[in-house]
A protein has these predicted regions:
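Short, flexible coil/linker elements and helix-boundary hinge sites characteristic
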Residues: 14, 97, 113, 144-145, ...
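Intrinsically disordered, low-complexity segments used for protein-protein interactions
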Residues: 1-2, 173
Length: 174
């Protein structure tokens, strides 16, 4: 009888041991999955942060490039192309939150470009290079936090209303 009891105890112990090992493996796998999931979330968050920084840097570089190109076109008297470059620069300055250069470009648009162009020339920019002043105004309205851009938006709209409709009207006006 003591052998039977000993055998039974060993068998029970072995079963308990196997069951405990299985439970430990299950728990370890669960903890591994939780750690992997948590690490994936953190890595994904960091990747998104870096992607956003890269996108901001790209937007900043593009904005400055188009800003300079607009200045060159303005100096050469190609105001229609300068306006297109300034519109593109303004969109990129909005993306990278460079409000100082955005104000500069918007002032160039209102002071140097729109007064010298007809609405026909301004609308032709959509076809020429995809620069749409109306989309820029919409985007400025969306990003107009605390009313910082209200006066320049108003000024652009007023200048557009005063602009001659066609190239012929512009020539007659001068």
């Amino acid at each position: 009888i003591p052998f039977v009891i000993q055998w039974y105890q060993n068998k029970t112990l072995k079963l308990s041991e196997d069951l405990l090992k299985k439970e430990i493996k299950i728990e370890i796998n669960k903890i591994k999955e939780d750690i992997i999931q948590e690490l994936n979330i953190k890595v994904e968050k960091k990747i998104n942060e870096y992607e956003n920084k890269i996108n901001e840097l790209n937007a900043s570089m593009n904005a400055k490039t188009f800003h300079l190109q607009g200045n060159l076109n303005k100096e050469k008297g190609y105001l229609q192309f300068a306006l297109g470059d300034y519109i593109t620069a303004a969109f990129d300055y909005l993306l990278c939150d460079d409000h100082q250069n955005l104000q500069t470009v918007l002032n160039l648009i209102t002071q140097n470009c729109i007064p010298e162009l007809s609405l026909e020339e301004i609308d032709d920019l959509i076809t020429i290079n995809g620069s749409d002043i109306n989309l820029l105004i919409e985007e400025l309205d969306k990003k107009n936090n605390n009313g910082v851009l209200t006066s320049i938006i108003r000024e652009i709209k007023i200048k557009l209303q005063k602009a001659p409709k066609t190239i012929k009207d512009k020539i007659e006006k001068k």
